[in-house]
C-alpha cells in the first residue's frame, strides 16, 4: 500500500515539474529573443550609424516589446549621459515627456553631419513626427576612450531640445 501511495505521489508531482520545466524553457527562449533584438555598441559602428540605430528604434518604439526603442537608445548613450539621464526608468520618463516625445514613433528622419573631429561628431537631425510636424535636434556622439567593453565605441553624449520647424503639407 505504501509503495502504491508513493507511486501515486510521484506521478502527481512529475506533471507539475514538467510544466515548470516547459515554462522555464519558454522564458529563456523568449528573453534571449528580446535581447537579441537590441544592438550593442561596438567599435565598428560609425557615428552616423549610432544615430540611425537610435532613431530607427525610436521610430518603432514598442516593437518587438514595449519601450524597446527607448531601451535600444539607452544602450548607445554614453556613460556620462546615462549618469545624468538615468537610471533607465527615468530615461524612459524623459523620452516620453513633452521635450522628446516627438521622437517616439516618428515617420521619418534626416541626418546631416555638421562637425567632425578625432573623437567627436555633431549632427543636425530633422524628424517628421507622427503628427506630421518637423523638429530639428543637435545630436552629438563621442568616441569612448576609457578601457572596458565600450572602448573605442561611438556613443551619444548630448541631444538638444527640439526646435519646431512647422508642419508638412
What are these regions (language model features)?
Residues 113-169:
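Exposed beta-sheet edge and beta->alpha loop/turn motif
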Residues 46-62, 72, 76:
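Short, aromatic-enriched amphipathic alpha-helices that serve as compact interaction elements
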Residues 34-38:
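Boundary at the C-terminal end of the N-terminal hydrophobic targeting segment
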Residues 64-120:
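Short solvent-exposed beta->alpha transition segments
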Residues 41-43:
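TPR-adjacent "capping" and linker segments in tetratricopeptide-repeat scaffold/adaptor proteins
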Residues 4-21:
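Bacterial N-terminal signal peptides that target proteins for export
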Residues 60-66, 147-148:
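Low-complexity, polar-biased intrinsically disordered regions enriched in Pro/Ser/Thr/Gly
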Residues 20-30:
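Bacterial N-terminal signal peptides
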Amino acid at each position: 500500500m505504501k509503495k502504491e501511495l508513493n507511486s501515486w505521489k510521484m506521478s502527481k508531482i512529475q506533471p507539475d515539474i514538467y510544466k515548470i520545466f516547459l515554462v522555464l524553457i519558454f522564458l529563456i527562449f523568449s528573453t534571449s529573443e528580446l535581447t537579441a533584438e537590441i544592438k550593442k555598441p561596438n567599435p565598428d559602428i560609425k557615428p552616423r550609424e549610432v544615430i540611425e540605430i537610435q532613431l530607427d528604434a525610436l521610430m518603432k518604439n514598442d516593437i518587438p516589446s514595449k519601450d524597446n526603442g527607448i531601451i535600444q537608445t539607452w544602450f548607445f548613450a554614453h556613460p556620462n549621459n546615462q549618469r545624468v539621464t538615468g537610471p533607465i526608468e527615468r530615461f524612459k520618463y524623459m523620452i516620453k515627456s513633452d521635450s522628446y516625445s516627438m521622437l517616439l514613433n516618428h515617420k521619418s528622419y534626416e541626418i546631416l553631419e555638421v562637425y567632425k573631429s578625432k573623437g567627436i561628431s555633431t549632427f543636425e537631425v530633422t524628424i517628421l513626427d507622427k503628427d506630421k510636424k518637423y523638429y530639428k535636434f543637435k545630436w552629438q556622439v563621442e568616441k569612448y576612450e576609457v578601457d572596458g567593453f565600450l572602448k573605442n565605441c561611438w556613443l551619444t553624449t548630448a541631444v538638444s531640445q527640439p526646435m519646431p520647424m512647422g508642419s508638412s503639407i
